[in-house]
Amino acid sequence: MKALEEELFSKFQLSAQQYNALRLLRSVYPASMQTLALGKLLISRSPDTTRMLDRLEQRQLIMRERRSENRRVVEIAVTTSGLDLLDEMASDVQAMHRRQLGHLNRTELRDLTALLKRIREPHEDASCVWLDE
Protein backbone atom coordinates (compact mmCIF):
# COMPACT_ATOMS: atom_id res chain seq x y z
CA MET A 1 0.00 0.00 0.00
CA LYS A 2 2.82 2.38 0.86
CA ALA A 3 4.47 1.73 -2.52
CA LEU A 4 1.26 2.82 -4.29
CA GLU A 5 1.23 6.05 -2.26
CA GLU A 6 4.87 6.79 -2.97
CA GLU A 7 4.35 6.14 -6.68
CA LEU A 8 1.40 8.53 -6.83
CA PHE A 9 2.78 11.33 -4.69
CA SER A 10 6.19 11.29 -6.37
CA LYS A 11 4.39 11.93 -9.66
CA PHE A 12 3.34 15.28 -8.15
CA GLN A 13 6.64 15.88 -6.29
CA LEU A 14 4.92 15.51 -2.91
CA SER A 15 5.25 13.23 0.07
CA ALA A 16 2.20 11.61 1.65
CA GLN A 17 2.73 13.94 4.62
CA GLN A 18 2.72 17.03 2.38
CA TYR A 19 -0.43 15.82 0.62
CA ASN A 20 -2.12 15.27 3.98
CA ALA A 21 -1.13 18.78 5.13
CA LEU A 22 -2.62 20.30 1.97
CA ARG A 23 -5.78 18.25 2.40
CA LEU A 24 -6.16 19.37 6.02
CA LEU A 25 -5.61 23.02 5.08
CA ARG A 26 -8.22 22.70 2.33
CA SER A 27 -10.71 21.49 4.96
CA VAL A 28 -10.59 24.91 6.67
CA TYR A 29 -10.20 27.02 3.51
CA PRO A 30 -10.52 29.99 3.17
CA ALA A 31 -9.51 30.20 6.83
CA SER A 32 -6.03 29.38 8.05
CA MET A 33 -4.73 27.01 10.70
CA GLN A 34 -1.97 27.40 13.25
CA THR A 35 1.14 25.29 12.74
CA LEU A 36 0.65 23.55 16.08
CA ALA A 37 -2.96 22.62 15.22
CA LEU A 38 -1.88 21.23 11.84
CA GLY A 39 0.88 19.21 13.48
CA LYS A 40 -1.65 17.60 15.84
CA LEU A 41 -3.87 16.58 12.93
CA LEU A 42 -1.20 15.03 10.73
CA ILE A 43 -1.36 11.24 10.55
CA SER A 44 2.39 10.87 10.94
CA ARG A 45 3.69 13.41 13.40
CA SER A 46 7.12 14.25 12.14
CA PRO A 47 9.57 16.48 13.99
CA ASP A 48 10.46 18.24 10.73
CA THR A 49 7.04 19.81 10.12
CA THR A 50 8.73 23.18 9.63
CA ARG A 51 10.92 21.83 6.79
CA MET A 52 7.90 20.15 5.19
CA LEU A 53 6.01 23.46 5.29
CA ASP A 54 9.09 25.26 3.92
CA ARG A 55 8.99 23.00 0.86
CA LEU A 56 5.26 23.60 0.34
CA GLU A 57 5.75 27.34 0.72
CA GLN A 58 8.67 27.36 -1.77
CA ARG A 59 6.31 25.76 -4.29
CA GLN A 60 3.68 28.41 -3.41
CA LEU A 61 1.20 25.73 -2.35
CA ILE A 62 0.76 27.30 1.09
CA MET A 63 1.39 30.67 2.66
CA ARG A 64 2.46 31.39 6.22
CA GLU A 65 1.86 34.49 8.25
CA ARG A 66 2.98 35.40 11.74
CA ARG A 67 0.41 37.01 13.99
CA SER A 68 1.27 40.59 14.87
CA GLU A 69 0.07 40.18 18.47
CA ASN A 70 2.20 37.05 19.00
CA ARG A 71 5.05 36.51 16.53
CA ARG A 72 5.54 32.92 17.76
CA VAL A 73 2.16 31.91 16.32
CA VAL A 74 2.26 31.06 12.62
CA GLU A 75 -0.93 30.78 10.58
CA ILE A 76 -0.86 28.55 7.49
CA ALA A 77 -3.30 28.63 4.59
CA VAL A 78 -3.50 26.71 1.36
CA THR A 79 -3.09 28.87 -1.76
CA THR A 80 -5.09 28.67 -4.96
CA SER A 81 -2.10 26.82 -6.46
CA GLY A 82 -2.36 24.29 -3.62
CA LEU A 83 -6.09 23.89 -4.22
CA ASP A 84 -5.47 23.47 -7.96
CA LEU A 85 -2.89 20.76 -7.28
CA LEU A 86 -5.32 18.88 -5.01
CA ASP A 87 -7.98 19.09 -7.73
CA GLU A 88 -5.48 17.84 -10.31
CA MET A 89 -4.59 14.90 -8.06
CA ALA A 90 -8.15 13.94 -7.09
CA SER A 91 -8.84 11.29 -9.74
CA ASP A 92 -5.40 9.72 -9.28
CA VAL A 93 -5.89 9.61 -5.49
CA GLN A 94 -9.29 7.93 -5.93
CA ALA A 95 -7.76 5.39 -8.32
CA MET A 96 -4.98 4.68 -5.80
CA HIS A 97 -7.56 4.09 -3.06
CA ARG A 98 -9.46 1.71 -5.35
CA ARG A 99 -6.21 -0.22 -5.96
CA GLN A 100 -5.48 -0.32 -2.22
CA LEU A 101 -8.97 -1.13 -0.93
CA GLY A 102 -11.08 -2.07 -3.95
CA HIS A 103 -11.31 -5.69 -2.85
CA LEU A 104 -13.36 -4.66 0.21
CA ASN A 105 -17.13 -4.25 -0.01
CA ARG A 106 -19.00 -1.24 1.40
CA THR A 107 -19.71 -2.93 4.74
CA GLU A 108 -16.07 -3.96 5.15
CA LEU A 109 -14.92 -0.42 4.35
CA ARG A 110 -17.34 1.02 6.90
CA ASP A 111 -16.15 -1.53 9.51
CA LEU A 112 -12.50 -0.76 8.74
CA THR A 113 -13.10 2.97 9.13
CA ALA A 114 -14.91 2.42 12.44
CA LEU A 115 -12.09 0.23 13.75
CA LEU A 116 -9.40 2.71 12.72
CA LYS A 117 -11.29 5.53 14.45
CA ARG A 118 -11.65 3.38 17.57
CA ILE A 119 -7.92 2.55 17.58
CA ARG A 120 -6.91 6.18 17.19
CA GLU A 121 -9.54 7.78 19.45
CA PRO A 122 -7.74 7.43 22.82
CA HIS A 123 -4.71 9.14 21.31
CA GLU A 124 -6.55 12.12 19.86
CA ASP A 125 -7.35 15.56 21.11
CA ALA A 126 -11.11 15.82 21.72
CA SER A 127 -11.31 18.60 19.12
CA CYS A 128 -10.42 16.27 16.21
CA VAL A 129 -13.34 16.64 13.82
CA TRP A 130 -12.73 13.39 11.94
CA LEU A 131 -13.71 11.37 15.02
CA ASP A 132 -17.30 12.57 14.60
CA GLU A 133 -17.67 11.60 10.94
Give the label of every model feature segment.
Residues 107-133:
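C-terminal regulatory/oligomerization modules of transcriptional regulators
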Residues 1, 42, 46, 90-93, ...:
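Flexible interhelical turns and helix-capping residues at alpha-helix boundaries
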Residues 4-45, 128-131:
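N-terminal helix-turn-helix DNA-binding core of bacterial DNA-binding proteins
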Residues 1-4, 89, 119, 123:
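Hydrophobic recognition helices of helix-based DNA-binding modules
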Residues 54-117:
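Charged, amphipathic alpha-helical coiled-coil/dimerization segments
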Residues 30-32, 94, 120-123:
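A short hydrophobic/aromatic micro-motif that marks alpha-helical segments and, especially, helix-coil
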